[in-house]
Amino acid sequence: MNIKVYAIGMVKDKNQLEAIKEYDKRLGRYCKIEMILVKNKEVLLKKLSNKSYVIKISTTGELFTSEGLAEKVKTLGVTGTSDMAFIYSEEHLEWDDHLALSKMDMSLGMAMTILFEQIYRGYRIIHNQAYHK
């Protein structure tokens, strides 16, 4: 699975960047993942592939469990989807699914860290590998 994580803005906190890099490294055994930070919605839309299954992440999306996200990723893979895009944005965009990490506001760096961790957790669940709750 090819996964691209898009967001408008910059991750400034070094600790959050290190955590994202660590999850990126761990995810390498399961998928190809890339974080793409852009300046605005127009740049994001130019970079977004029209063949990707788009999951918008915002505070107004549906709350999912880790198991629910794992099932979503697994189902997409089994049904032939090879490209996924997570877009962290409150902007109005077209999407295939709309999820929330939390109903609370958080910094971009925190949201990206949590999203990468949840994708990693999802793959551990899919492969029946231990992961603490």
Can you name each region flagged by the protein language model?
Residues 1-25:
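N-terminal beta1-alpha1 ligand-phosphate binding loop
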Residues 5, 55, 115:
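Conserved RecA-like P-loop NTPase ATPase core
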Residues 6-8, 57, 87:
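Short hydrophobic segments within beta-strands
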Residues 11-13, 61-64, 92-93:
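Short acidic, S/G/P-rich loop/turn micro-motifs used as interaction or catalytic elements
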Residues 16-20, 66-70, 112:
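Conserved strand-to-helix beginnings and helix N-cap segments that scaffold or border functional pockets
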Residues 28-84:
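S-adenosyl-L-methionine/SAH cofactor-binding core of RNA-modifying enzymes
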Residues 68-106:
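Catalytic beta-strand/loop module used to bind and position nucleotide/cofactor moieties
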Residues 91-133:
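Structured adenosyl-cofactor binding patch, chiefly the S-adenosyl-L-methionine
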